[in-house]
Amino acid sequence: MHFETVIGLEVHVELKTDSKMFSPSPAHFGAEPNSNTNVIDLAYPGVLPVVNRRAVDWAMRASMALNMDIATNSKFDRKNYFYPDNPKAYQISQFDQPIGENGYIDIEVDGETKRIGITRLHMEEDAGKSTHKDGYSLVDLNRQGTPLIEIVSEPDIRSPKEAYAYLEKLRSIIQYTGVSDCKMEEGSLRCDANISLRPYGQEEFGTKTELKNLNSFNYVRKGLEYEEKRQEEELLNGGTIGQETRRFDESTGKTILMRVKEGSDDYRYFPEPDIVPLYVDEEWKECVRQTIPELPDERKAKYVNDLGLPEYDAHVLTLTKEMSDFFEGAIEKGADVKLTSNWLMGGVNEYLNKNQVELQDTKLTPENLAGMIKLIEDGTMSSKIAKKVFPELAENGGDAKQIMEDKGLVQISDEATLTKFVTEALDNNPQSVEDYKNGKGKAMGFLVGQIMKASKGQANPQKVNQILKQELDKR
């Protein structure tokens, strides 16, 4: 028997507002524990929540960017549960009347475009954070009340690979809107996954399992891959799948049972009596619509149609707004479009991955990268020298030409000096000279390599090729 995988994702995104969802406390990451709190966050008796207008605007902006319908009438509800980092013993959320519904995004997997539906986007407040250490539980309520949006996909995803592509695209769109930085390491983007299997051809869904502790997109994919395999083996062996919540264990790559899954009835939702229903008229919707910036698909089309970049380059460059903005800044400073694209996808990305840093954590700027690329363009700097200059540029900033001179890496373009290197290479490799005369094209490349090696990569490659051909023709 063959099974079809059915996946739905629930993504929590922390909105980048100055204050919290229902209180005036600052909503900033990294503050001293319990320093960004007030009587509303601490649930003192008699205090009343006040809705953050900016958070509503940004929830609407995100909804529109995800092709959703904005509800004219929506409301807030109480989701009741007890936990130490939830002082009210309920969370203010939206249950049956969310702010956004019926959206979608298009993803690309293996060269094919697929549309993934989005059921809803609703607003809610975050809980605090519990830390367990040395037999004690510590509670930090700085995060309590931080504005969140939860984006719930339709069960349209059919593989862990599609889930990964969906998350990448969703993060990209939200980042471009400016409502969140979507940093998983800081908790501003979190994902829970629901997965079930059903026999091919069956319309009814199988029993779903919820996965938690998915702290990176890679862990989402790995957790789903493991769960897909686990459920298939269980079903093939005649077993059944229970509706449960499981935790992904990063060290083993397996999922571990946490608890039997609750239903919505367990939370005893009811309308929030302290907040009036939300009414959004057409004028308000239009005001928000006017604030939506250029989104990744628009930029990608621009890069392909206007700048002549390949589809792949355009896709990679627009995955994050930070990289896309950097690319546009560099070409505005006069850098060649394709060379800039190659460097950002190649040398820059390799440096970021190797050092586990973000672009903003380096000393790179569109100006200094463009300066280096222009030196490569005009022949002042070879690609080999650029690879030696680049790490210094990324770590300390400055001017690429000055770094090249300080390191003694100035490209050799003097004809007499280059002719000497060429002559030595020809004298030391007579067989390659003979091979060249016999029409073996690889011989030329070998000789160029010998010359570059002898010059420690500093010979001007264009002039080397020119002089080498002249000298070979003389022999």
UniProtKB/Swiss-Prot annotation:
Gene3D superfamilies: 1.10.10.410, GatB domain, N-terminal subdomain. It catalyses: L-glutamyl-tRNA(Gln) + L-glutamine + ATP + H2O = L-glutaminyl-tRNA(Gln) + L-glutamate + ADP + phosphate + H(+); L-aspartyl-tRNA(Asn) + L-glutamine + ATP + H2O = L-asparaginyl-tRNA(Asn) + L-glutamate + ADP + phosphate + 2 H(+). It holds the Pfam family GatB_N. InterPro entries: Asn/Gln-tRNA_amidoTrfase_suB/E, Asn/Gln-tRNA_Trfase_suB/E_cat, Asn/Gln_amidotransferase, Asn/Gln_tRNA_amidoTrase-B-like, GatB, GatB_C_1, GatB_Yqey_C_2, Gln-tRNA_amidoTrfase_suB_CS. GO terms for molecular function: asparaginyl-tRNA synthase (glutamine-hydrolyzing) activity; ATP binding; glutaminyl-tRNA synthase (glutamine-hydrolyzing) activity. Its EC number is 6.3.5.-. It comes from the Bacteria. SUPFAM superfamilies: GatB/YqeY motif (SSF89095), Glutamine synthetase/guanido kinase (SSF55931). Keywords: ATP-binding, Ligase, Nucleotide-binding, Protein biosynthesis. GO terms for biological process: glutaminyl-tRNAGln biosynthesis via transamidation; translation. Allows the formation of correctly charged Asn-tRNA(Asn) or Gln-tRNA(Gln) through the transamidation of misacylated Asp-tRNA(Asn) or Glu-tRNA(Gln) in organisms which lack either or both of asparaginyl-tRNA or glutaminyl-tRNA synthetases. The reaction takes place in the presence of glutamine and ATP through an activated phospho-Asp-tRNA(Asn) or phospho-Glu-tRNA(Gln). Belongs to the GatB/GatE family. GatB subfamily. NCBIfam families: gatB, PRK05477.1-1, PRK05477.1-2, PRK05477.1-4. Heterotrimer of A, B and C subunits. This is Aspartyl/glutamyl-tRNA(Asn/Gln) amidotransferase subunit B.
